Amino acid sequence: MSEEKIYTKFAPNAEKNLVIEVDGEKYERFPVRLPVIMDGDDIYTIIKDAVEGYATADDMIYVSEKIVAISQGRAFKVDEIKVSKLANFLQKYVTKTDVGIGLGSPQTMELAIRELGRVRILFAAAVAAITKPLGIKGAFYVICGPKARAIDGPCHYTIPPFNNYAKLAPKDP
């Protein structure tokens, strides 16, 4: 297959480069357009079919955790998440950043409570309440771990219908 055909099929978004350099090594990245992944979809087969004839045995294929979580039924419509008083209270103290919603919405905080348990969330919140005024940030997420850090809320740049969903980390990715 010609290199030109590969570059045409796997063209990046306008602001992205196909070739990146990391620690002096150059890597070519070929974004693969997939159908919208839904709960129950076999993402292995969908991806395999999409790269068939292009990928080689030496290629590495990376998949976003979001589509893995969606295919596992771990994404939830935000307007269908019943938010507890605890989630409503705690989310007010989450530092808002421009990298994502994280646990800064009542719905995502509720998912964290369900996923990690009230005791762990309350313990993490208590530690954060003590350490944050001392200038120590991030204690909540250190205690809650990667499952809490991976929870994400809806955002405008996500493909519909998942721009109105919150998601948990993938289960056994």
Task: Go through each PLM region and give its residues.
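N-terminal and secondary-structure boundary signal
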Residues: S2-P173
